[in-house]
UniProtKB/Swiss-Prot annotation:
GO molecular function (one): ATP binding
Domain of life: Bacteria
Binding site for ATP: 13-20
The entry's keywords: ATP-binding, GTP-binding, Nucleotide-binding
List of residues binding GTP: 63-66
Family: Belongs to the RapZ-like family.
Protein name as it appears in the record: Nucleotide-binding protein SZO_12220
Pfam families: PapZ_C, RapZ-like_N
Record function comment: Displays ATPase and GTPase activities.
Lineage of producing organism: Bacteria, Bacillati, Bacillota, Bacilli, Lactobacillales
Length: 296
């Protein structure tokens, strides 16, 4: 059995109050997540996690979709409280009756407790049954006036710690426009206006990771000026992206073929940012031209 404590968050609350967004937010924070776990399986699941010692952060959605929820939840909570290796917190999501009715009408889904099909009756019944659990919850969040992004921000603020800063990371990548834009890019910068090393015979087969190409790209006055503007733009906005709860920010820099100019710029940017942020550097098309030539 593990000697490390497992941080367990049970996500529950009113149906339609935002539990799907919540569990996705916990996943972005590095939690192992399970949606709609039958309450009876929770103790066995936690015992397995303790034995394997694979994760110390777990978030489970347990709600009215589990039909025996109210018969089993109290005994499960008692079991967890007796286990010294488990630190339990309950997140209860709520919203006004009118907002929940509006959300159900929008999605055209039926309420799990609306036996006669009347959503409002199901909401009222569920709210009554959840009173004891709500009173036990350490975190109660009313999502009536929250957008999904705002709810993610609330969860990040309440459940992330300083050690979770690595849950926000930066991906710096180079690419070639001739092969298409990266579909997952958040910020895209075009350096095709810079002098192209491709037209220097001695540099053509090298890449922006080679010192000769890097120096050729960066020694031009317009390159240095643009890079300084780029850095001045990116550095101040990174904390804002992190604050908004974004888990990965992908910065893509493109040139024509993705072999020279964009590689040099992406590499320099990664070098300058990596001291302050978790970062991964990649060059999508750096070998694309060579592969194409070899196939022809």
């Amino acid at each position: 059995m593990s000697d490390k404590q497992i941080n367990l968050v049970i996500v529950t609350g009113m149906s339609g109050a935002g539990k799907t967004v919540a569990i996705q937010s916990f996943e972005d924070l590095g939690y192992f997540t399970v949606d709609n776990m039958p309450p009876a399986l929770v103790p066995k699941f936690l015992e397995l996690l303790e034995r394997t010692n694979e994760t110390q952060k777990v978030a489970l959605v347990v709600d009215m979709r589990s039909r025996r929820f109210f018969k089993e939840i109290n005994s499960i909570l008692d079991h967890i409280e007796l286990n010294a290796n488990l630190k339990l917190r309950i997140l209860f999501l709520d919203a006004t009756d009118s907002e929940l009715v509006s959300r159900y009408k929008e999605t055209r889904r039926s309420h799990p407790l609306a036996a006669d099909g009347r959503v409002l009756d199901g909401i009222r019944r569920e709210r009554e049954l959840l009173v004891p659990l709500k009173s036990m919850s350490q975190h109660v969040v009313n999502t009536t006036d929250l957008t999904p992004r705002q709810l993610r921000k609330v969860i990040s603020d309440q459940f992330s710690s300083e050690s979770d800063q690595a849950s926000f990371r930066i991906e710096v990548m180079s690419f070639g426009f001739k092969y298409g834009l990266p579909l997952d890019a958040d910020l895209v910068f075009d350096v095709r206006f810079l002098p192209n090393p491709y037209y220097q015979v001695a540099l053509r087969e090298q890449t922006g990771l080679d010192q000769a190409v890097f120096d050729y790209v960066m020694t031009h006055q317009e390159s240095e000026a643009f890079y300084n503007h780029l850095l001045d733009l990116i550095v101040p906005i990174l904390p804002a992206y992190q604050k908004e709860g974004k888990s990965v920010l992908t910065i893509a820099i493109g040139c024509t073929g993705g072999q020279h100019r964009s590689v040099a710029f992406a590499h320099r940017l990664a070098q300058d940012l990596t001291a302050d942020w978790p970062l991964h550097e990649s060059h999508r098309d750096i070998n694309r031209r060579k592969e194409t030539v070899n196939r022809s």
